[in-house]
């Protein structure tokens, strides 16, 4: 690890604990993981309260939201009273109550406007994808608002498989706009982005002018710039 740091080596695939992503080495010891429900919590008036449900647009969401299958819709302002019958307190936060619950069904008791209700929910081990997608949605809304809908926004997290999925899944919803912003900040690298170039650099090859109806050009799945 010291040599990798001194030489500034990239793509070494050596992680903490001596574990390699290609096998070998010792993995980190098992721990009871904290479960997450995809919400922002705030402690106020002696209760743990949902400040916001992290909810990206379904069409662009990569991760299943743990509250999506709940019979009752949890919303901002709801108070979490207990998990599996054990009450929460100032000293027992939602994170403490959800230790060791990842992938397991738990009963969460909420209160809204003086009425309590229980839901069955399966906590997830990370909210990273949900929060990442919500951030993308916020950026897209900001671009649409600032340009009166004339400019589209696409974020790609890397130039690997995930980034290619990002590009294609967002491209077709934004391609009708006059121009596109392709945001690649903090991208994780990957492959030479030939597929990106092929899609974004497509040129029109034919035009259709019908006697009745609108004219159009092909390929239909290309963006030809403003």
Where in the sequence are the language-model features?
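Beta-propeller domains
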Residues: 1, 20, 31-35, 39-44, ...
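Short coil/turn segments at secondary-structure boundaries
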Residues: 1-2, 13-22, 110, 209-214
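GHKL-family ATPase ATP-binding module
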Residues: 1-4, 8, 151, 181-182
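Generic structural signal for bulky hydrophobic/aromatic residues embedded
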Residues: 3-6, 53, 199
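A structural signal for alpha-helix termini and helix-coil/disorder junctions
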Residues: 5-13, 202, 206
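Gly/Ser-rich, acidic/histidine-flanked active-site/gating loops
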Residues: 70
């Amino acid at each position: 690890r010291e040599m990798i740091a001194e030489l500034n080596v990239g793509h070494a695939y050596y992680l903490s604990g001596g574990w390699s992503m290609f096998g070998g080495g010792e993995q980190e010891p098992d721990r009871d993981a904290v479960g997450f429900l995809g919400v922002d919590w705030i402690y106020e008036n002696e209760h743990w309260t949902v400040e916001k449900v992290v909810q990206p647009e379904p069409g662009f969401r990569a991760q299943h939201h743990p509250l999506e299958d709940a019979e009752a819709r949890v919303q901002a302002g709801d108070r979490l009273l207990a998990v599996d019958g054990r009450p929460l307190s100032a000293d027992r936060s939602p994170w403490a109550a959800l230790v060791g619950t990842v992938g397991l069904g738990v009963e969460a008791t909420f209160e809204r406007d003086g009425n309590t209700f229980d839901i069955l929910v399966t906590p997830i081990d990370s909210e990273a994808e949900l929060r990442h997608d919500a951030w993308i949605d916020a950026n897209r809304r900001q671009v649409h608002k600032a340009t009166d809908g004339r400019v589209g926004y696409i974020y790609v997290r890397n130039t690997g498989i995930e980034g290619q999925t990002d590009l294609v899944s967002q491209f077709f919803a934004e391609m009708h706009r006059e121009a596109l912003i392709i945001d690649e900040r903090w991208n994780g690298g990957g492959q030479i982005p030939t597929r990106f170039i092929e899609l974004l650099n497509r040129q029109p090859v034919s035009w259709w002018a019908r006697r009745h109806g609108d004219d159009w050009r092909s390929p239909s799945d290309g963006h030809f710039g403003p």
